[in-house]
Amino acid sequence: MNIFTRYHLPRVVSGVILPLFLFHLLPYVTCQQESVPTNSIRQTNLSADSIIAIVVLAIFISLGMVSCCLHCIFYREEIGAAGQDVLHSRARRGLEKEVIESFPTFLYSEVKGLKIGKGGVECAICLSEFEDQETLRWMPPCSHTFHANCIDVWLSSWSTCPVCRANLSLKPGESYPYLNMDVETGGVQKLPNERSLTGNSVTTRSRSTGLLSSWRMAEIFVPRSHSTGHSLVQQLGENLDRFTLQLPEEVQRQLVSLNLIRRSHIVLPQAVSSRQGYRSGSVGSERGGFSQGRQTHRRALSMSFSFSFQTASVRSIHDMNDQAQAKDKYFGERSFERLMPEEKV
């Protein structure tokens, strides 16, 4: 039973069909009364009764039609208001700008040689491969990576990951655990592998690698159906793996810390750039000073990101060289002392 049948059928029966049925019976009533012996008084009374009945029926019919029209008008207004609420709710389904900017961005050339495996080479939105100088945005909850422009447009209308549908929205008062960082020291306090979102608990690799593992297990039981010898399950797994950028834990921490430092020091480069422009003699070229400061800040961040992962290896090599030199020096001095004759007193 639809909405019209539920709400309008009783009104139509009581306001339209019943008066029409009574109006249809009037000729039979008048015919039966005309068969009665007539006189002038009774004819006058019968004509008055019929007129009254017709007027009453007309009033009932008009009232029924007016009530149906009013109900339709009010019902249409309610539907319009509900539709506006649905449209507004759909428009508010996206993430806020601050939440979108909290996801780390970087150049593909900076992490191209640090990624684990062969994944993370294609954007799932525009289906184009990453270039070295393109800016990417990385989703820490699911390790999926997209072009910054593509994912920003998507997250402005939707609050889920385009690949694994992980819910990225937060409840009021919540915060992302991987954003717990001491901005003054520049170090991440904690980067857990799991974080709880609204409704579901999504791990860093639960959606992507979990589906891949299930598909690879199902590959054993699914027969080869393609002429090239590749199964459908294997193709699905490989296609999904192309969108997943797996990075070492230290690299993930560096990405998050650099992103937070960039967001927290967004005003500082302007002051530095204005001073640099004034000291360099470019008085009046305030725009050039600001752009120079932003370029200097970006260069410093990229240099810190590029060389931060090589510090440990360089230090270890220097330490090993120093220890080897000290050891050789020690043994060389000892062996040389043994060859020297003892002086007699």
Swiss-Prot record:
Residue numbers of Phosphoserine PTMs: S264
Pathway(s) the chain acts in: Protein modification; protein ubiquitination
Reaction equation(s) it catalyzes: S-ubiquitinyl-[E2 ubiquitin-conjugating enzyme]-L-cysteine + [acceptor protein]-L-lysine = [E2 ubiquitin-conjugating enzyme]-L-cysteine + N(6)-ubiquitinyl-[acceptor protein]-L-lysine
Example GO biological process: protein ubiquitination
Keywords assigned: Membrane, Metal-binding, Phosphoprotein, Signal, Transferase, Transmembrane, Transmembrane helix, Ubl conjugation pathway, Zinc, Zinc-finger
GO cellular component: membrane
Membrane topology: Single-pass membrane protein
SMART domains associated with the record: RING
Gene Ontology MF terms: transferase activity; zinc ion binding
EC primary class: transferase
A Pfam family reported for this protein in Swiss-Prot or TrEMBL: zf-RING_2
Entry keyword annotation includes Metal-binding: yes
PROSITE patterns for this protein: ZF_RING_2
Family to which this protein belongs: Belongs to the RING-type zinc finger family. ATL subfamily.
UniProt remark on domains: The RING-type zinc finger domain mediates binding to an E2 ubiquitin-conjugating enzyme.
Official protein name in the record: Putative RING-H2 finger protein ATL36
Organism: Arabidopsis thaliana (Mouse-ear cress)
Gene: ATL36
